[in-house]
Regions:
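Domain-level recognition of soluble alpha/beta enzyme cores
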Residues: 84-144
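Short substrate-entry loop that stabilizes the transition state in hydrolases
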Residues: 133-136, 140, 145, 149-182, ...
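Cap/lid segment of the alpha/beta-hydrolase catalytic domain
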Residues: 150, 154, 174-194, 205, ...
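Alpha/beta-hydrolase active-site loop
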Residues: 189-214, 252-253
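Short glycine-enriched nucleophile-adjacent loop
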Residues: 207, 230-242
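Alpha/beta-hydrolase fold nucleophile elbow
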Residues: 215-225
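Short beta-strand/loop motif that positions the catalytic acidic residue
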Residues: 308-310
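Short alpha-helix in the alpha/beta-hydrolase fold that links the catalytic acid
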Residues: 318-327
């Protein structure tokens, strides 16, 4: 586990002494533009974990160098390894059959394009992608995206378009029976075990799609999941959940009203289903994951690279019982965002959404969702680039 807190007055970097990973987070974090790090000044041992504390002070020379390095990084990605201009983003619907009920499943692909993209209005969302542009000419890694309970395939559109601008295809699904229009299957085995099968079906469909198939790098498939989508990702990575743990968790945290609405009791409506991994997926990013249903033993099969983000003010899911416990039981990298809540990881809200969905859009004082997303979008792209060996 490697825990990094986003910069505040004092930073804590946590790493088990047994870890083989170097201290690369000391140099890789994107710091606020008004500060830089002076150096390490203290160590502390706690629960077999080594905590390093660093202090910071303004250093405008290094700030300029960091700014220029970010500009250079963005220029490299805009140019791309294959030297094509893929600043544009296209979107297209995919034909996918839900393996649980064999009905059509809403799925969208975001893809790099050399054409100019414009903002497309879809419901309350303003998507920075166009239906009318064509896909670029090269091979691209593919990222599968799974929303949280009662979400939709558009809920993380800014991250999807950011990845597409950097040369990724992103395939996002609306999980049947667990979305904003129909949540009738939430908290059932047909959803918990069905979601990973739906993601695998979306991947298989993309690999056969007449537009996308010839542009997908089959050796570079990744996954990104939010909240319950984190459960989906852990199962796809090989994790084995213990469903009874949810009731134990909800007995302690009954106010986690979305996940604990049924007090953590899982409906066994499809007892024949079981957790099914997909070895085609080789790298995982989880945002505020619901992971309490996994024991350390149930996480042992997971070997793929794993990056986790969580807000330390998440009131929907306990960070200690979910993201942080998950990081302690795996080789994951964990980034903790001070004062961020659960829904901070949803796309920044349009004015329409701010009016109609305040619970999803409101933030604590001092939290700038747009700025946080700009930061984590770069972090996520860098993580996938490195885990896939993309220069």
């Amino acid at each position: 586990m490697n825990i990094t807190k986003f910069p505040t007055t004092e930073e804590c970097y946590v790493l088990p002494k047994s870890s083989k990973r170097p201290w690369i987070h000391l140099s890789k974090n994107i710091f606020p533009t008004n500060s830089t790090y002076l150096g390490i000044f203290g160590f502390e041992k706690k629960q077999k974990i080594l905590i390093i504390r660093a202090i910071r002070q303004p250093d405008f020379g290094r700030i300029f160098l960091k700014f220029m390095s970010v500009i250079f990084f963005l220029m490299l990605h805009v140019a791309g390894a294959n030297a094509e201009n893929t600043n544009g983003v296209g979107i297209k619907k995919l034909e996918v059959v839900n393996p649980i009920d064999h009905l059509p499943m809403e799925t969208v692909a975001f893809f790099p394009s050399s054409g100019r993209s414009e903002v497309t209005s879809i419901g309350p969302y303003q998507i920075a992608a166009s239906r009318s542009v064509s896909i670029g000419s090269n091979l691209y890694p593919l990222i599968l995206l799974s929303h949280g309970n009662m979400g939709s395939m558009w809920g993380h559109h800014d991250l999807a378009t950011a990845l597409a601008q950097q040369g990724y295809i992103v395939v996002s699904v609306t999980h049947p029976g667990d979305n904003f229009q129909n949540s009738s299957l939430m908290g059932s085995t047909s959803t918990i075990y069905g979601r990973p099968l739906q993601i695998s079906a979306a991947l298989s469909a993309a690999l056969k799609d007449s537009v996308l198939a010839s542009h997908i790098d089959k050796d570079r498939i990744g996954f990104l999941g939010f909240s319950a989508g984190g459960t989906t990702g852990l199962i796809l990575a090989g994790g084995k959940p213990t469903l009874t743990r949810l009731a134990e968790y909800c007995a302690k945290r009954p106010n986690d009203h979305h996940v604990c609405e049924a007090k953590g009791h899982i409906r066994l409506n499809r007892p024949e289903l079981s957790p099914t991994a997909d070895p085609r997926i080789r790298s995982f990013v989880l945002l505020a994951p619901l992971s309490v249903i996994f024991t350390p033993e149930g996480l042992q099969p997971i070997k793929a690279p794993l990056l986790i983000f969580v807000g330390d003010k998440d009131e929907e899911l306990s960070p200690d019982d979910n993201a942080i416990a998950l990081a302690k039981s795996t080789e994951a990298w964990l980034q903790v965002i001070p004062n961020a809540g659960h829904f901070t990881f949803l796309s920044p809200c349009s004015p329409d959404m701010n009016r109609t969905m305040p619970d999803l859009c409101a933030e604590r004082k001092g939290i700038d969702r747009v700025a946080i997303h700009q930061r984590i979008n770069v972090e996520i792209t860098t993580f996938f680039d490195e885990s896939f060996g993309i220069k």
